[in-house]
Swiss-Prot record:
The protein, known as: DNA-directed RNA polymerase subunit alpha
Lineage of origin: Eukaryota, Viridiplantae, Streptophyta, Embryophyta, Tracheophyta
UniProt keyword Cytoplasm present: no
Family: Belongs to the RNA polymerase alpha chain family.
Principal location listed in the UniProt entry: plastid
Gene that specifies this protein: rpoA
NCBIfam families found in the cross-reference section: rpoA
Gene3D superfamilies documented for this protein: 5' to 3' exonuclease, C-terminal subdomain, DNA-directed RNA polymerase, insert domain, RNA polymerase, RBP11-like subunit
Amino acid sequence: MVREKVKVSTRTLQWKCVESRRDSKRLYYGRFILSPLMKGQADTIGIAMRRALLGEIEGTCITRAKSENIPHDYSNIVGIQESVHEILMNLNEIVLRSNLYGTRNALICVQGPGYITARDIILPPSVEIIDNTQHIATLTEPIDLCIGLKIERNRGYSLKMSNNFEDRSYPIDAVFMPVQNANHSIHSYGNGNEKQEILFLEIWTNGSLTPKEALHEASRNLINLFIPFLHVEEETFYLENNQHQVTLPLFPFHNRLVNLRKKKKEQGFQYIFIDQLELPPRIYNCLKKSNIHTLLDLLNNSQEDLIKIEHFHIEDVKKILDILEKK
């Protein structure tokens, strides 16, 4: 008896790194693929992953510098080749790696003449420097220079305020983004309904994380963002005959409408047009297409009526109420 082999497509998603290189101490590159994906899924994942890579991953930066010898951040100090502003800019570019929480202090204390590099920074145990050769300043005379530093771990970026200084300490623009760039592209294959996609993801980092580490952290952050949706306590709306209609998060629409009517019953709702409410364009167009032209028309509809409107969402109901209560 000969048994014929049957091919079964399990559609198990697989990802792998197809290219990895270190261009310098402060530039890593990685290229990854994820497949097989159904049509449209690659773009969904690619956009979300790129945003998570660029905005959700924490990094470590020097955020403040302090020295008794610095009168202001655009001054020059005798015996130092660079201006104070240039020194602060150089400190801004120092790439650090850490697992710290909150802020830590660091110190530079050197005697000239000579070059000051990242190697001269005395760091707390939880912080390390990626490139010890990064230049900070040049001392041209035998002077002592001590600079106190504040180190923070955060995400995104923090821009210094022009007058944000304390006792001769100066804020430094901080970019807490270990991922310098991320791109995604899509390759489609197959025919008709069997069409599938491969997602290509390219990641460049500053060396404080490898692209693979960045991909893992971005993935974890995305998962954590979506976990709450798995545990939402749903409340069920019922019609008057108790037949099940729809399951949605409950907004106290009716009670808020009653309060609105009590507060504004002296006003003629039929003379207030929705054009006057400054609604977002999409909500305005949805209401107009449903022949809702005045505030009276709007308030005569229940929450259930409104969410039946094409392209109208439960969040739009809350948005309308928020706008009305401010009027």
